[in-house]
Amino acid sequence: MNTLIYISALGILSLLAEIFNARKAIVPITIIGLLAIFGFNISEYNHLGSYYNNMMVVDKFSVAFSSLFIIITVFLVALSHEFYKEQKTKISDYVGIKVFLLSGAVAMVSFGNLSMFFLGIEVLSISLYILAASNRLNLKSNEAGMKYFLMGSFASGIILFGICLIYGATGSFDLNKILILINTQAYPQWYYIGIVFLLIGMLFKIATVPFHFWAPDVYEGSPALTTATMSTLAKIVAMATLYKLVTVLLPIQLYSIQIIIVCVAIASMLLGNIMALRQNNVKRMFAFSGISHAGFMVSTLLLTSNAASTLLYYASAYAIAGIAFFAVVMYVTKDKENETINSFNGLGKTHPLLAGILTAALLSMAGIPVLSGFFAKFFLLNQLVYTDWLIVVFVAIISSIISVGYYFKIIIAMYTKESEQTLPNVPVMYQIVAVVALILNIALGLFPNVVLKLL
């Protein structure tokens, strides 16, 4: 609970910095504040409890995922200084919004009451609507903001309807009371209908098939840093929340729900990777890649043991690789209307360090050994084999092979084609973020138990 309070206070401090004309200090102060909050959050790992009549719950799940969210936010805030260099008068707004977005993320994995869950998801969603349309002079950004707002509002409405049905069936928003009632009596059909509505709404937020159609256009039109936020932080927050909802509200999974999860996972893996093969725009490609990774993460709901730790590890590997990827993409595609693969031509010769980092990030997402992306998929598929979901394992392997095709399109462009443009000097912060993210990615691959043993 204190973590959420400190994050909210830091967001207010970021906004106040503008009043005192301390724009240059906003990013450093925010990063230091986030690192301090990260340390405090870790200290709560073994101090479990609930607050405000169980509105907020501190447990190992919430602490572990909140720590991951804080780390990703540190990277995003660090990238903000250079990305918003031409909009210095608004940097406090953008940084403040990212911090408030983090507060919504923490609330979404720490809730003990469905009303707090909905409050968290709205704080996160509204922050993203603003960031998606933040480039007011760009029509694509305006379009992305409007599409994301409409689709997000639709998903929020479905989630709220599901919560209402659950409340109508149980008479409570409190998860503990709902769980006690589930174990002591049979529920009317609308309780399970409410769970299905919750599932549909969260799948919209995660962008899985068949609720994915908004993602490519929104990712392409949004500013690159906002796309990075959506595809890393927002996606893993929604996935962690979905996991908590399903495991708490359905302590014994129904076979019909499992079939829905299997169909969504398989369709997302296949369609995401097949559609990514056809893309020439890097952000659209990453949108479809994210859909396929969402399919992998959704399949953790089928596991009977070590599901939470597997999801945490996969989310960590995916998000950190995504940060390294976008640190390079933001530099290469700066001031370009279209972020095509041709923009990366010759990067291996002109900027070998960035090319190497981008290559490693892409290989990690493809599931190539040594990097953490490989171990994330390996641990997940190994657990799926034990639960006898062999069809999901087979499709996951096929889709991983397909993904190599479009990831290598970028790698080939970097190392085999000549550059058609002269790029400016690489901002130091982009290099630092990319290098640190890559080091964390490799460390996760070499020492997976550090994360796997947290849950």
Swiss-Prot record:
Q: Which residues cross the membrane?
A: 25-45, 61-81, 99-119, 149-169, 193-213, 257-277, 285-305, 312-332, 355-375, 391-411, 432-452
- Kindly list the GO CC terms recorded for this protein: plasma membrane
> Catalyzes what?
a quinone + NADH + 5 H(+)(in) = a quinol + NAD(+) + 4 H(+)(out)
Compartment list: Cell inner membrane
Keyword annotations:
Cell inner membrane, Cell membrane, Membrane, NAD, Quinone, Translocase, Transmembrane, Transmembrane helix, Transport
Q: What class of enzyme is it?
A: translocase
Q: How does it sit in the membrane?
A: Multi-pass membrane protein
**GO terms of molecular function:** NADH dehydrogenase (ubiquinone) activity; NADH:ubiquinone reductase (non-electrogenic) activity; quinone binding
Its predominant location is: membrane
What Enzyme Commission number(s) appear in the record?
A: 7.1.1.-
GO biological processes: ATP synthesis coupled electron transport
Pfam families xref list: Proton_antipo_M
Q: How does it assemble?
A: NDH-1 is composed of 14 different subunits. Subunits NuoA, H, J, K, L, M, N constitute the membrane sector of the complex.
Name the family the entry cites: Belongs to the complex I subunit 2 family.
Biological role: NDH-1 shuttles electrons from NADH, via FMN and iron-sulfur (Fe-S) centers, to quinones in the respiratory chain. The immediate electron acceptor for the enzyme in this species is believed to be a menaquinone. Couples the redox reaction to proton translocation (for every two electrons transferred, four hydrogen ions are translocated across the cytoplasmic membrane), and thus conserves the redox energy in a proton gradient.
The protein in question is named: NADH-quinone oxidoreductase subunit N
- Organism whose genome encodes this protein: Flavobacterium psychrophilum (strain ATCC 49511 / DSM 21280 / CIP 103535 / JIP02/86)
